[in-house]
Amino acid sequence: MAKAMEMAYKNLEEETAYIKGLKKYMIEKLESEIEDVQFYGKCTDIDDSLYTVLSCNFPESENSEMLMFNLDIKGVACSGGSACSSGSSKGSHVLTSIVPDSMRPGVRFSFSKYNTKEDIDFAVDRLKELV
């Protein structure tokens, strides 16, 4: 157990900085390439939010209801709503409290040391096709 912990924490600072950079890059890409994207809570504050997660929503469109399905078909791994409502067929009570009465599709992206800027470019390009 001690060896596993040692290995997990060996490069933690470098990996944290790398992942924060990816999240910042995705925020900048979304803001510059998708009109009217909205971010939930403080998730754009890299130092005051969970650095491995970005939650946002997009303008309503004819593809809104099928956004998650279409992203999956196009090879983008992401989740709908909040982690608190994962697996539920009902909307997220957490996100509803942040953005009440929103019909905008919400998406949650997660980042790890295994992601790249190319992954983000791919995801944003697919989003641009759908929103």
Describe the role of every protein-language-model region.
Residues 2-131:
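Pyridoxal 5′-phosphate
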